[in-house]
From Swiss-Prot:
The keyword Ribosomal protein does not apply. Belongs to the MATA1 family. The gene is MTLA1. The C.albicans mating-type-like (MTL) locus contains, in addition to the genes for the regulatory proteins (MTLA1, MTLA2, MTLALPHA1 and MTLALPHA2), a and alpha idiomorphs of a phosphatidylinositol kinase (PIKA and PIKALPHA), a poly(A) polymerase (PAPA and PAPALPHA) and an oxysterol binding protein-like protein (OBPA and OBPALPHA). Most C.albicans strains are heterozygous at the MTL locus and do not readily undergo white-opaque switching and mating, but mating occurs in hemi- or homozygous strains. Mating takes place in opaque cells, produces tetraploid progeny and seems to occur rarely, if at all, in nature. Conservation of mating capacity is rather thought to be due to the simultaneously regulated white-opaque switch, which seems to play an important role in host commensalism. This is Mating-type-like protein A1. Keywords: DNA-binding, Homeobox, Nucleus, Repressor, Transcription, Transcription regulation. CDD domains: homeodomain (cd00086). GO terms for molecular function: DNA binding; DNA-binding transcription factor activity. Induction: Moderately repressed by HBR1 in response to hemoglobin and growth signals. Forms a heterodimer with ALPHA2. GO terms for cellular component: nucleus. Mating type proteins are sequence specific DNA-binding proteins that act as master switches in yeast differentiation by controlling gene expression in a cell type-specific fashion. Transcriptional corepressor that acts in conjunction with ALPHA2 to repress transcription both of homozygote-specific genes and of genes necessary for the white-opaque switch, a prerequisite for mating. The keyword Transcription applies. It comes from Candida albicans (strain SC5314 / ATCC MYA-2876).
Amino acid sequence: MNSEIESSLTLLKSVEKLVQATSVYKNEDNEEIFLQLKRERQENSNSHEETETLFHESLDRLMKLSSIAGSKVQYELSLNNLYNLLLRTRKQEEEEAFIFPTVSTEEFALEQITFEVSDQMDDDKDSEDDILIKGEEIKKSKKKRQRLDNSTKEFLEKVFEKNKQPNRRERELIAEKHGVSLSQIRVWFTNKRMRKKEPKSKAKSSSNST
């Protein structure tokens, strides 16, 4: 008998950590309170099976403790707090089951190149005259050189909108992704920047002549 009481008291202590004590039911019959709680919960049950099992097992064991210990043990449970516990549990289960929306492979690759990769880069910025490379690199690039296809150009345009002067590591990633040489990528960005500057220069010279 004593071991059953000790075991039930241990359960009671663990339940009390989850449910705030109150004096609402202090002078009422404990067993009737638990039965009423169980009936109401069964009538309004929309929770997950695991949550329901925890709820009913806890009440059943507390009822057993009530019959053993009688008036020596006071049960003070708040129905609202017990329901709030179940609601919090359900919300947590729903949040854990949430699936994040997926993004397209192209968008993900673009974000990776223009933002995340920059954390691993050197602080040095390549200047525009960086286009001159060593003789060996020129020879290698000529052997492997191929024309940029439309899909590669479209991707470079997207990158250029976000970053007009990518560093060396970013250009290497782009070249590797599309199977072209590093020098082709560097030339493309240099030419693109120059073309962007030309209209401004022409507009400035025409305004000066007038």
